Amino acid sequence: MNNLAFLFPGQGSQFVGMGKSFWNDFVLAKRLFEEASDAISMDVKKLCFDGDMTELTRTMNAQPAILTVSVIAYQVYMQEIGIKPHFLAGHSLGEYSALVCAGVLSFQEAVKLIRQRGILMQNADPEQLGTMAAITQVYIQPLQDLCTEISTEDFPVGVACMNSDQQHVISGHRQAVEFVIKKAERMGANHTYLNVSAPFHSSMMRSASEQFQTALNQYSFRDAEWPIISNVTAIPYNNGHSVREHLQTHMTMPVRWAESMHYLLLHGVTEVIEMGPKNVLVGLLKKITNHIAAYPLGQTSDLHLLSDSAERNENIVNLRKKQLNKMMIQSIIARNYNKDAKTYSNLTTPLFPQIQLLKERVERKEVELSAEELEHSIHLCQLICEAKQLPTWEQLRILK
């Protein structure tokens, strides 16, 4: 049995035309576009299909638009396929989509709340002094150290999203962000400015966060039907009562996305489906782990693969075998740090023949390893890494 999680994208995934194929093919999509439009007194369908990209990117517009398309994708999936998830997770704004789909908030409540949130966030930086940038090819600790070194009360900057091992987002005052980028580039990092209208998940959102508390107090939050991973803690919400506090701090705290995906991995998730426009989270997941099969659902045509359970199962089997083969090879060829040759030999001599037999089975296309064989293979690799006394970071790289 495959364990399934649903992922929901955040701001930056918007594009003109998003959700149109769902609207063309499903009555429920037409209904939800109408409900969203009624809830916030604006034509959400027109904004998504015919709007100007600049207008769609404005925070107060992008947030309800993305949430609407994401919830439509979820409802289409449940209507057409209906396999329930074990976990839900949303990236930044996407956490609100997850809350709706798990029954914590109604769709209309979420659209209204997210519109208020977008207005507050946009108004928190009226002079547009802030910006956000994706930073790649650098690990989190050096980047955090740079932000701490450069950030001041008047020119703040900090890590806003921890997306993967070497892909993060910084947010804050434009001048401070530029300083961090210059120093990070000397360390070999690359950067890309994000197409957003405010410095989200930074201290520049503090006033918006405080005002948002008033809006949050107007809503009741029910317990979730399935566990939702919080961006703030990278573990599931305890209950509906904890949602309000998390959503207020959500504006100023970083999105712990890589940790959230590792949580899913550790709890046996084998497949994820990204519900919403584009496939940004599918791409991010591939940078975090090769143990989870990821699929987008942003348009009607994506349903074809999702409805083919045999092909999906084959994808998972092939993914596991490919990753296991890579893990075996890397554990065997990794440097031996153990200076006690006799102890090392005693530990590994019984292991290598077992690894070789399993490796031969993995490489045979017609063979499907049992769950016990998979677990045993990973355990053997772990024992070899420990016998070689590999540094923790290298063991994690091999075994992740």
Curated annotation (Swiss-Prot):
**Which UniProt keywords are given for this protein, alphabetically ordered?**
Acyltransferase, Fatty acid biosynthesis, Fatty acid metabolism, Lipid biosynthesis, Lipid metabolism, Transferase
Catalyses which reaction(s): holo-[ACP] + malonyl-CoA = malonyl-[ACP] + CoA
Q: Which domain of life is it from?
A: Bacteria
UniProt EC number? 2.3.1.39
Q: Which Gene3D superfamilies match?
A: Malonyl-CoA ACP transacylase, ACP-binding, Malonyl-Coenzyme A Acyl Carrier Protein, domain 2
Q: Which GO terms describe its molecular function?
A: [acyl-carrier-protein] S-malonyltransferase activity
Q: Which residues form the active site?
A: 92, 201
> Pfam families, per this entry?
Acyl_transf_1
Q: Which family does it belong to?
A: Belongs to the FabD family.
Q: What does this protein do?
A: Is involved in the mycosubtilin synthetase assembly, by catalyzing the transfer of malonyl groups to a specific acyl-carrier-protein domain on MycA.
Write the protein's name: Malonyl CoA-acyl carrier protein transacylase
Q: What is the lineage of its organism?
A: Bacteria, Bacillati, Bacillota, Bacilli, Bacillales
